[in-house]
Amino acid sequence: MSRKDSWLTIGKLVGAQGLRGEVKVNPSSDFPERFINPGERWLQKNTEEPSRIELKSGRQLPGKSIYIVSFIGITDRNKAESIVGNKLLVPSDQKPKLKEGEFHLVDLLGLKAKFTQDGSDVGEVIDLTSAGNDLLVIKLVEGKTVLIPFVKEIVPVINLKQGWLLIKPPPGLLEL
């Protein structure tokens, strides 16, 4: 499985934790079991082919969105530091089933962003990030990149089949 769309990024390894090989993960998944339940995961460094790794255990830091995980074979801080920066992946066929109106954030990548007022093109969703809540990274038509909070009030309509979402940004948000 090597095609880009065959994988689902569930987080990024952002730092070593302690001396016993634990690693901090910034999640891009709303499913905690992906960071807690043992089993097969995959690591990807930059654009290299993903490599298999076995998650041994994990826990969420109290009051934070960061998880601390341990992998089989990563037993000290040096080994943990050697995998920092990698993306944590699962095969895309492991996407959980969603209820009506729910979305996998990764499915929003590449969608056209349009204004709710007149349907005119604003730009394209090029990335997702988290800063307390989910943010869409949108490259505007004129080339500038902006962060849009992914909340119903600002992103009221999403049409995955037609490849667009509507945004209703508060005044000044696109000028930041």
From Swiss-Prot:
Keyword Kinase set for record: no
Disulfide bond annotation, renumbered to this chain: none
Coiled coil: none
Cellular component aspect of the GO annotation: cytoplasm; ribosome
One function term, GO molecular function aspect: ribosome binding
InterPro entries registered for this protein in UniProt: PRC_barrel-like_sf, PRC_RimM, RimM, RimM_N, RimM_N_sf, Transl_B-barrel_sf
Quaternary assembly: Binds ribosomal protein uS19.
Family: Belongs to the RimM family.
Comment, domains: The PRC barrel domain binds ribosomal protein uS19.
Stated role: An accessory protein needed during the final step in the assembly of 30S ribosomal subunit, possibly for assembly of the head region. Essential for efficient processing of 16S rRNA. May be needed both before and after RbfA during the maturation of 16S rRNA. It has affinity for free ribosomal 30S subunits but not for 70S ribosomes.
Protein name listed in UniProt: Ribosome maturation factor RimM
Organism name: Prochlorococcus marinus (strain MIT 9211)
Highest classification ranks of the organism: Bacteria, Bacillati, Cyanobacteriota, Cyanophyceae, Synechococcales
Gene that encodes the chain: rimM
